[in-house]
């Protein structure tokens, strides 16, 4: 597993505003969208491309274009939906699938309750959107699900990560070089309820209101 923590003043600035308990849902959604676009720039650094001829107003030359099959973006419901627009802004031709996963607040284990994905992901680059990498259970379950269906490599974009969750993911995919986590920050720890400290609260609730 590879870890990329984005060190950039704009990332830090937007993350600080997201952490602020006074930030309302509309502002939180906008900031999350902007932050994801910044993370996506780094997350797609190794996206697969191929040479492509192009004629400019001056002469013919060769550039690149995304290869087939197209990348697939997979937000984990529901909080991952708040990251989708920021991701597809940079990858507008990507396909979008969905994974519905929920964490049991007693056991902290993740279970899948819905999926809208191709059965065969052979050769696909997959970008998973999950704002909070806390215990790591949800992300491990999601990545395992995707790799079992043939995904070539999986990159997870997270607004925040906890050391405990990163260790769980690292242990699960220690020998899998094609699993990458891209995050804006690694926070101090998890509390007794499995929440990231200092964190930013429950990302889903702050994006959409408590439901």
Swiss-Prot record:
The record lists the catalysed reaction(s) as: UMP + diphosphate = 5-phospho-alpha-D-ribose 1-diphosphate + uracil
Q: Output the Pfam families linked to this UniProt entry.
A: UPRTase
Give the Gene Ontology MF terms in alphabetical order. GTP binding; magnesium ion binding; uracil phosphoribosyltransferase activity
EC annotation from Swiss-Prot or TrEMBL: 2.4.2.9
Which residues does 5-phospho-alpha-D-ribose 1-diphosphate bind?
78, 103, 130-138, 202
Transferase: present as a keyword of the record? yes
Q: List required co-factors.
A: Mg(2+)
Question: Which residues of the sequence carry a binding annotation for uracil?
Answer: 196, 201-203
Cofactor comment in the record?
Binds 1 Mg(2+) ion per subunit. The magnesium is bound as Mg-PRPP.
| Keywords from the UniProt entry | Allosteric enzyme, Glycosyltransferase, GTP-binding, Magnesium, Nucleotide-binding, Transferase
Top-level EC class: transferase
Concerning PANTHER family, the annotation shows: ADENINE PHOSPHORIBOSYLTRANSFERASE, URACIL PHOSPHORIBOSYLTRANSFERASE, CHLOROPLASTIC
Main function: Catalyzes the conversion of uracil and 5-phospho-alpha-D-ribose 1-diphosphate (PRPP) to UMP and diphosphate.
Q: What is this protein called?
A: Uracil phosphoribosyltransferase
């Amino acid at each position: 597993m590879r870890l990329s923590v984005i060190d950039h003043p704009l990332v830090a600035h937007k993350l600080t505003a997201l952490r602020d308990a006074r930030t309302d849902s509309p502002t939180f959604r906008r900031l999350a969208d902007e932050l994801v676009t910044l993370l996506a720039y780094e997350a797609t650094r190794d996206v697969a491309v191929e040479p492509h001829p192009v004629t400019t107003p001056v002469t013919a030359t060769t550039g690149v274009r995304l290869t087939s099959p197209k990348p697939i973006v997979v937000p984990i419901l529901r909080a991952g939906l708040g990251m989708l627009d920021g991701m597809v802004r940079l990858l507008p031709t990507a396909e979008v699938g969905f994974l519905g996963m929920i964490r049991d607040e007693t056991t902290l284990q993740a279970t899948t309750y819905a999926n809208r994905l191709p059965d065969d992901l052979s050769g696909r680059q997959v970008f998973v959107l999950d704002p909070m990498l806390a215990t790591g259970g949800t992300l491990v379950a999601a990545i395992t699900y995707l790799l079992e269906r043939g995904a070539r490599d999986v990159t997870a974009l997270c607004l925040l990560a906890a050391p405990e969750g990163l260790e769980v993911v690292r242990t699960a995919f220690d020998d899998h070089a094609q699993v990458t986590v891209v995050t804006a920050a690694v926070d101090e720890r998890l509390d007794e309820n499995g929440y990231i400290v200092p964190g930013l609260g429950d990302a889903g609730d702050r994006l959409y209101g408590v439901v």
